[in-house]
């Protein structure tokens, strides 16, 4: 089972409600939000540094918990949220302050327990396949930070360590 609902928005409220009702009736969690684009952008940029750190740690959660990976990825996630909010012209989400080492530590312990499959194996296969997209996203955060004169030291260090760039 999925942990979060798929997010939907649109100009035709009745149509969006109909889609989400059909999905829920079929067992797929779905919800209506004011702007799915913003919601998805925030969830993506909060997750991406965890994926990059996991890759840097050999796709093992136990290895992510060693050294400063968790501190680095938490800082990168907060920076990415700030950058994304600036790009979209909205406020940072309420959960930004929660993106700290303890939260990502809990995620690193809970991911394999919560997923109905081996999360490490899945993440490695999926994100290796879309690795170029991951690198482009990280580069995009760095370019956005430069253009807006916003902090990106954690993103830059994580990117350098894992991708050498």
Report residues per predicted region.
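Helix-loop-beta segment of a Rossmann-like dinucleotide-binding subdomain
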Residues: 1-7, 57-65, 118-128
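Rossmann-fold dinucleotide-binding core
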Residues: 1-44
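Short-chain dehydrogenase/reductase
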Residues: 9, 13, 70-71, 131
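Short, well-ordered alpha-helical segments in soluble proteins
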Residues: 23-30, 53-56, 84
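Inter-helical turn/loop segments and adjacent helix faces that build the functional surface
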Residues: 31, 62-67, 145-152
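Active-site-proximal catalytic alpha-helix in oxidoreductases
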Residues: 37-81
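NAD(P)-dependent Rossmann-like dehydrogenase/reductase catalytic/cofactor-binding core
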Residues: 78-165
């Amino acid at each position: 089972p999925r942990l979060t609902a798929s997010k939907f928005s649109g100009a035709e409220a009745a149509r969006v409600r109909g889609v989400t009702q059909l999905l829920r009736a079929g067992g797929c969690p779905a919800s209506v939000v004011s702007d799915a684009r913003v919601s998805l952008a925030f969830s993506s940029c909060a997750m991406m540094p965890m994926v990059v750190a996991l890759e840097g740690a050999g796709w093992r959660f136990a290895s992510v918990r060693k050294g400063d990976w968790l501190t680095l990825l938490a800082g990168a996630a907060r920076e990415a949220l700030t950058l994304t909010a600036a790009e979209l012209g909205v406020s940072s989400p309420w959960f930004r302050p929660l993106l700290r080492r303890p939260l990502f530590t809990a995620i690193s312990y809970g991911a394999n327990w919560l997923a109905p499959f081996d999360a490490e194996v899945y993440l490695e296969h999926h994100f290796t396949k879309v690795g170029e997209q991951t690198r482009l996203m990280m580069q995009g955060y760095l370019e956005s930070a430069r253009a807006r004169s916003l902090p990106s030291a954690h993103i830059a260090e994580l990117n350098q360590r894992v991708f050498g760039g």
